[in-house]
Regions:
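Second-shell loop/turn segments in exported
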Residues: 78, 115-118, 206-208
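N-terminal Rossmann-like FAD-binding beta1-loop-alpha1 element of flavoenzymes
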Residues: 62-89
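Active-site/ligand-binding neighborhood in enzyme catalytic cores
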Residues: 198-316
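Dinucleotide-binding Rossmann-like beta1-alpha1 core, especially the glycine-rich loop
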Residues: 109-193
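Extracytoplasmic/secreted proteins, especially bacterial periplasmic and envelope-associated proteins
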Residues: 75, 123, 127-130, 217, ...
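Glycine-rich FAD pyrophosphate-binding loop
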Residues: 81-104
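Extreme N-terminal leader/targeting segments of oxidoreductases
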Residues: 2-63
Length: 317
């Protein structure tokens, strides 16, 4: 039958047993095509290469050069121009400003590439409050600050799927009188009694108590206060990973407490104040805010630019 190797009976039977499994293999779907959105990595790679000798530099001077047109860069440019400094230039690596507050479009629908909501700021962030009034998200009525409901999203109450059921809020459920509920309430008391925190952080000042918290991990601080409950620590670890990208064993106690004490506090299930304020959000996420910061800066904004060096000199950089 041919000159190839013979197929013995044992090999044939083993192969035949596996034939039905080939029908279970998922076929490749050519309609699902992946792609790369977000950072322009090829521009970042240029930093590894020397500048071609044929490229002749063009010198320009500006009173202020801001490297990066994320929210911080755009806000800084806005404040400079508000203070009368008109010669402000922004250099941005990507094709669009916004940093992690940019958006993408899929089939004509906008979606965020990063930050996707804005909590209503506290009184300490009065610059942000002023700007939100300026863009129409806030207004005053009868001496009260009122948010435009068209841009608000109220947190859904059933958000945690635990033991086969949905539960209110994000905390794992706990029976009244249980050790877990006691741990929740104890942590809420400690957050309420913590040293002053604020956003922005410098509005709260810095004290020896803050330095002590900053010198220990959040896990060590919880241990010191006897907070070993697994449900509480799971939630706090989740919060730290969500905001800081690291868990209780790496994040400082200052950062862990700042997450709660600078904003909405911590509320045990059933607490009358457990409902948080609604947040501002949009289909494109915080790119909605980026657009309103960037539009007045279009003539000053230079996208697709790689900054290779910033060198300090006697009277400038």
């Amino acid at each position: 039958m041919g000159t190839g190797p013979a197929l013995d009976r044992r090999t044939l039977l083993l192969g035949a047993a596996a034939w039905p499994l080939t029908a279970c293999r998922r076929e490749n779907d050519p309609s699902l095509q992946g792609g790369w959105v977000g950072a322009a990595h090829e521009r970042g790679h240029r930093l590894r290469e020397p500048v071609p000798a044929a490229v002749r530099p063009v010198q320009r001077r500006a009173a202020v050069v801001i490297v990066g047109a994320g929210i911080a860069g755009l806000a800084a440019a806005r404040e400079f121009t508000r203070q009368g400094v008109d010669d402000v230039q922004l250099l941005e690596l990507e094709d669009q400003p916004g940093g992690n507050s940019r958006a993408h479009r899929m089939d004509g629908m906008a979606c965020p590439l990063g930050a996707h909501y804005l909590p209503q700021p506290g009184e300490a962030a009065h610059e942000v409050l002023d700007w939100l009034h300026e863009v129409g998200l806030l207004r005053h009525e009868a001496g009260r600050r009122v948010a435009d409901e068209r841009h608000l999203c109220h947190s859904p109450q059933e958000r945690l799927f635990f033991d086969g059921a949905w539960h209110d809020g994000l905390l794992p459920p706990a029976d009244p009188g249980s050790a877990t509920m006691a741990a929740y309430k104890r942590f809420a008391q400690l957050v309420a009694a913590a040293p002053a925190f604020a956003i922005p952080t410098h509005r709260a000042g810095w004290s020896a108590a803050h330095a002590e918290l900053d010198g220990q991990t959040f896990a060590a601080w919880l241990d010191r206060h006897g907070l070993q409950d697994p449900a509480l620590r799971w939630y706090l670890d989740y919060c730290c990973r969500d905001d800081y990208g690291a868990g209780l064993d790496s994040v400082s106690a200052w950062a862990g407490l700042h997450y709660f004490a600078s904003r909405h506090g911590f509320h045990a299930p059933g607490d009358a104040e457990s409902e948080r304020e609604p947040v501002f959000t949009w289909p494109e996420g915080n790119a909605w805010l980026t657009e309103r910061l960037a539009t007045p800066m279009r003539e000053r904004l230079h996208t697709g630019r790689v900054v290779q060096r910033v060198r300090e000199q006697r009277d400038g950089v």
